[in-house]
Curated annotation (Swiss-Prot):
TM spans (from-to): 7-27, 56-76, 82-102, 116-136, 157-177
Family statement drawn from the similarity comment of this UniProt entry: Belongs to the PlsY family.
Function: Catalyzes the transfer of an acyl group from acyl-phosphate (acyl-PO(4)) to glycerol-3-phosphate (G3P) to form lysophosphatidic acid (LPA). This enzyme utilizes acyl-phosphate as fatty acyl donor, but not acyl-CoA or acyl-ACP.
Membrane topology: Multi-pass membrane protein
Organism of derivation: Erythrobacter litoralis (strain HTCC2594)
Protein name: Glycerol-3-phosphate acyltransferase
Entry keyword Cell membrane: yes
């Protein structure tokens, strides 16, 4: 059954899911305190990994993927005309959760869930580019930024032009949130995976 829904409502549904701060909740439940007080101060899986608990970081990653996927799936199932805006809402919710003073994560994992929700081709392109760029550069931020740009191109390639504007907005947001990483890249100071900063 399909309904017509105002795009802003679809975006709010996405935001509600995306703004669940799994990284913060899991680290607190595990007795590790506030993950925002370490590393980058973000609530995503990469910063949770800095606690030294790989299992907790992996669980955060999975749940961040799920919270991107679920609102897009709901939009596919019930609101066929508002899928892209549910996707945008989910990433915005993760990056700027109202409950945490609009300071969340950088959105790469949540956007992966979003992309798989938008279509397997888009999701696989996202994952492929992320993995290839990580293998080549061993720099997580480069892999993430490359993947978000590739997602918009993949949406166009797979015949989903209505998904391109939300994915472009998402790419701009995520790249902007990586501005400190970009500055370190330009200085040659961005840490590589497997190396201590």
């Amino acid at each position: 059954m399909d309904y017509n829904l105002d795009p802003s409502i679809a975006a709010l549904i996405g935001y509600a899911f995306g703004s669940i701060p799994f990284g913060l909740l899991l680290t607190r439940m595990a007795g590790m305190g506030d993950v925002r007080s370490i590393g980058s101060g973000n609530i995503g899986a990469t910063n949770v990994l800095r606690t030294g608990n790989k299992g907790l970081a992996a669980l955060t990653l999975v749940l961040d993927l799920v919270k991107g996927f679920v609102p897009v799936w709901i939009a596919w199932r019930y609101f066929q005309n508002d899928i892209g805006w549910a996707a945008l809402g989910a990433v915005v919710g993760h990056c700027f959760p109202i409950w945490l003073g609009f300071k969340g994560g950088k959105g790469v994992a949540t956007n992966a869930g979003v992309c798989f929700g938008l279509g397997w081709g888009i999701g696989l392109a996202y994952a492929f580019v992320w993995l290839v760029m990580l293998a080549i550069t061993r720099i997580s931020s480069v892999a993430g930024m490359s993947a978000v740009v590739a997602a918009a191109g993949a949406a166009w390639y797979f015949g989903r032009p209505t998904f391109v504007p939300p994915l472009v907005i998402i790419a701009v947001i995520i790249i902007w949130l990586h501005r400190a990483n970009i500055r370190r890249l330009l200085r040659g100071e961005e840490p590589r995976v497997g190396n201590k900063p």
